Amino acid sequence: MFDRLPALRIFLAESRLGWVPFWLEEADYWYERHRHWAARLLDLKPLAQRPSDYVRQHIYFSVQHVERVAIELRQHVGVAHIMFATDFPHIECDWPNTRPFAERLFAGLPPDDAFSIAAGNTLEFFGLGDTPMGRRVRSAAPR
């Protein structure tokens, strides 16, 4: 699908992120292990890339306050593909304590990574960077 639609981007909201690095490794392993017989016996065409490459190029994930491990594993997915979420207005949302939760989540991160995950990636994904709110948020970005 991604070879036919190279500009396709998918955002998995409320999916969490901590499981993704393990899943990427597993997907590549099992694809490599079975692709030869699947092509031969089932006439399935081989992928142009590894499954993990498609995910890293096309899939975006949300991360919430309790996912410090996911933040520490961010390079496995790519910082540009991670967006902070509060899950408002659901019962498990961070509000009204979003700021302290976010501060704990992003503690020790390079400021550029923290800004990208907290706001920048969302502005980019949804095309909000040139809106009045987007410009205001970007003005707070680390320099």
Each model region followed by its residue ranges:
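Aromatic-lined glycan-binding groove of carbohydrate-active enzymes
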Residues: R4-S52, R56
